[in-house]
Amino acid sequence: MSNPIIDIAALRKSYERAELNEDASHADPLKQFDQWLNEAIAAQVPEPNAMTLATVDSKLRPSTRVVLVKGYDARGIVWFTNYNSRKGLELAGNPYAALQFHWVELERVVRIEGVVEKVSAEESDAYFNSRPLDSRIGAWASPQSEVIASRSVLVTNAAKYGAKFLLQPPRPPHWGGYRLQPDNWQFWQGRKSRLHDRLRYTLQADSSWLRERLAP
């Protein structure tokens, strides 16, 4: 028996878990992000550190993908990847990017915009060396974003580099970290009747943050 056709347009949810107001939110968006991320972790949201990364190519065509945040502080949000991947090449041509976290279970979204730079070689080395061995070999084995004939290419490459490096693969020169330095944050909390809470933080010339409420 075939499944009934789902009416996508009729799918909707009422958001009633929480609220976000100026008095209860932090004046510093990094502190607000830290609070929300830790609440997502405590709520056992699947992969709470997963975020969508948006970049733009030389023809102004945007692209997105999901990456994992591996660190954050006053300097920005950090993730690691292949510098020769599509996102790496696009960031080399246009360093401005946007991030989005969507914690469905908490009815929350965080959007972050800013300029991106590579982290230091020392930071990349430290994180690379903390990864499981198969992940380190995988960084060598996968020519990310390139066309390959079949999955066997990856399997063969992994075996080759595993035999070459044994237990001590060095960090590939084409692999490392990026840091997005935020100049704009938005925090969205779902509310009843689609009257959601939405706060925007904009970086000012004196390095302070302007907090404003936006209509949802």
Curated annotation (Swiss-Prot):
InterPro entries attached to this UniProt entry: Pyridox_Oxase, Pyridox_Oxase_N, Pyridoxamine_oxidase_dimer_C, Split_barrel_FMN-bd
Binding site for substrate: 12-15, 70, 127, 131, 135, 194-196
Keywords associated with the record: Flavoprotein, FMN, Oxidoreductase, Pyridoxine biosynthesis
Binding note for cofactor: Binds 1 FMN per subunit.
Enzyme Commission number(s) from the entry: 1.4.3.5
TM region(s), chain numbering: none
Pathway(s) served: Cofactor metabolism; pyridoxal 5'-phosphate salvage; pyridoxal 5'-phosphate from pyridoxamine 5'-phosphate: step 1/1; Cofactor metabolism; pyridoxal 5'-phosphate salvage; pyridoxal 5'-phosphate from pyridoxine 5'-phosphate: step 1/1
Catalytic activity: pyridoxamine 5'-phosphate + O2 + H2O = pyridoxal 5'-phosphate + H2O2 + NH4(+); pyridoxine 5'-phosphate + O2 = pyridoxal 5'-phosphate + H2O2
Molecular-function GO terms, alphabetical: FMN binding; pyridoxamine phosphate oxidase activity
One Pfam family recorded for the sequence: PNPOx_N
Subunit structure: Homodimer.
Biological role: Catalyzes the oxidation of either pyridoxine 5'-phosphate (PNP) or pyridoxamine 5'-phosphate (PMP) into pyridoxal 5'-phosphate (PLP).
Name listed for the protein in its UniProt record: Pyridoxine/pyridoxamine 5'-phosphate oxidase
Organism: Polaromonas sp. (strain JS666 / ATCC BAA-500)
